[in-house]
Amino acid sequence: VRLFTAIYPPADAVAHLTAQVTGLRLAAASAAGTNVRLVDPTKAHLTLAFLGDVEAARLTEVRQALGAAVDDARGGAVLGAGLAGPPVLRLGGGGRFGWGRSTVLWVDVRGEVTRLGALAGAVRVALATAGLPSDERPFRPHLTIARPGDRLPHADIEADLATLDAYLGPPWPAEELVLVQSQPGPPSRYHHVTAWPL
């Protein structure tokens, strides 16, 4: 099974972001028929660790490792001693990964990002300690909004990045860590396997 761990923003934060994305040039291009591969708002998430393909027989090990990481977080060992509750985040700003055919536009994460990074680190360490696969890339919290590739003029991408730079969504608590199984598409499908409250 193909797995990743994620934090899902609440519906009001996603709706706020969706209203912003609707005003971008890439949304106008999509409405005109250009395949800019807008991300379905119901799938909007922040990936903490990508495990990739894991044997179904190891799913129990994955759950145990993630449960231990969340227990550490709840106990203050990860999210900061004396800081009760989940990290409070907000979506704001934005950027791009890649160029040309591999261009991806994303929204940045603001707020208690250090605590979110500590949780991502704990998740990755717990997976590695259990001998499970996990990201080796540095954690860069973001929410992908589109994969336009080279189907939009450079000027439109730059204009959308400038618009995103001024964006700041409402604050929200990252209330749970979710283990997600992805099934490649089109369209790709996500199935929530297990969730742990933070």
What is each model feature region?
Residues 1-198:
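Histidine-dependent nucleotide/RNA phosphoesterase domain, centered on the 2H-phosphoesterase fold
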